[in-house]
């Protein structure tokens, strides 16, 4: 069973992602939530065992690109999948070069989540 951290400034989107993860039939145990990159780093620093991080790109305080850099700068190798409405290849390339493992575009279905995340967790 996997513990997952969802980092997104929209509480509604965090709930949708959480529900979709469970509907996809993925082996999910705990789901932790953070409203931006700073909160996400705090969850990680708390010592919780996390096997997957899902992060939005556009967030206040610390966006997803900065968040990925900070996670990797701390030596954390947990897979990070960017969840975004951004369609531009450049922003996805930047996220990947910062250390993101993959990306998925909103909106998505539970089946799409299963396909994208099934091999990771």
List the model feature ranges, each with a label.
Residues 59:
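Receiver (REC) domain active-site loop signature in two-component systems and cognate sites
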Residues 33-42, 64:
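Helix N-cap/capping motif at the beta->alpha junctions
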Residues 108-117:
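C-terminal output helix
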Residues 9, 106:
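A Lys-centered signature of the CheY-like receiver
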């Amino acid at each position: 069973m996997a513990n997952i951290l969802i980092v997104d400034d929209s509480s509604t989107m965090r709930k949708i992602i959480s529900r979709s993860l469970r509907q996809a039939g993925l082996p999910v145990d705990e789901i932790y939530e953070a409203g931006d990159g700073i909160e996400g780093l705090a969850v990680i620093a708390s010592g919780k065992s996390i096997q997957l991080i899902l992060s939005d790109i556009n967030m206040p305080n610390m966006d997803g690109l900065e968040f990925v850099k900070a996670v990797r700068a701390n030596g954390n190798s947990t897979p990070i999948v960017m969840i975004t409405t951004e369609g531009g290849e450049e922003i996805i390339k930047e996220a990947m070069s910062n250390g993101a493992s993959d990306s998925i575009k909103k909106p998505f279905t539970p089946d799409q989540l299963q396909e994208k995340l099934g091999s990771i967790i």
